[in-house]
Amino acid sequence: MTQHRDTATASELIDGESAPEALVDAERSQRSRAVIAGQGNLALVNTQWITGEVEASQPIWGVPGLWSPLPLGSSGLLLSASASDGIFVDGELVDGAIVVAGMDAVSPSRIRFSETLTGTVIASEEDDYALRVWDADSEGIRDFGAIDAFPYDPAAVVEATFTPNAGTCDVSIAYLKEQGKTQEKTLPGEITFTLGGEEHRLVVYGDGPNWLLIFADATTGDTTYSVGRFLSVAPDATGSLMLDFNLAYLPPCAFSYNFNCPIPPKQNRLAIAVTAGERNVLARNDDLLH
């Protein structure tokens, strides 16, 4: 869900634009490049969880080999393959059984199935593991046209205050692929700000020092992506920060159905329209990609 953020150099500033507007344009250009990378959001073609009995082998759609859970407390999956399968893990051809370390390990394994297909192993909060399959020549990448976004709006940059929890802040969180189920999570705190003439108090996610704001507003499902949008926030030592909704970005599930994104909780559903930031993912013909 976390997106890499680059800063613009002076040479990237565009004639006639303010420095903040040029930085937003540079960020949007970087985003458009990132989502079509070999393991960018548009490249994800499968996420398959491997659960059940330890060493109970399972095939995974689209790639060779058999994949098995490891004992509880071990990071990753057990892969069984022959040399003819052509699977490379950390640069070595697999011929037999090998542990493929997850992204939660100190040194995650690098998996290559072909010139375009690669893999990573991810962990859930319950310590289950899944293989993610990435295709650098996916249909999504081939059909991608642009990330549609609102024009830059200086009024969408507002001062805010972060208030850490005095004790706990338990919030029910639902996920896109698990509707009807919720998880109770203790969140780090709230941010308070004024936008559209109204004061708002929203909860944030993460482990700090950078937090993630997951929100919906009056544009959600109308002129912006139906699930909601994300915004990275980073308060200073006093809890003060600037919220720039021009940098609001689409969650990974807007690009691939194989991501499972959190849905904005009721506390984070704004009645006002936030007409700033990314809107939707477009195909080459300007239709919605999904």
Predicted regions and their residues:
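Forkhead-associated
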Residues: 52-105
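Short strand-coil-strand connectors
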Residues: 61-63, 90, 113-115, 194-198, ...
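N-terminal cleavable signal peptides for secretion/export
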Residues: 13-64
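Surface-exposed beta-loop interaction hotspot
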Residues: 120-185
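Phosphate/adenylate-binding glycine loop and adjacent helical scaffold
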Residues: 91-94, 98-129, 142-143
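Long, compositionally biased interface segments
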Residues: 28-31, 234-290
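Actinobacteria-biased recognition of intrinsically disordered, low-complexity terminal regions
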Residues: 1-17, 288-290
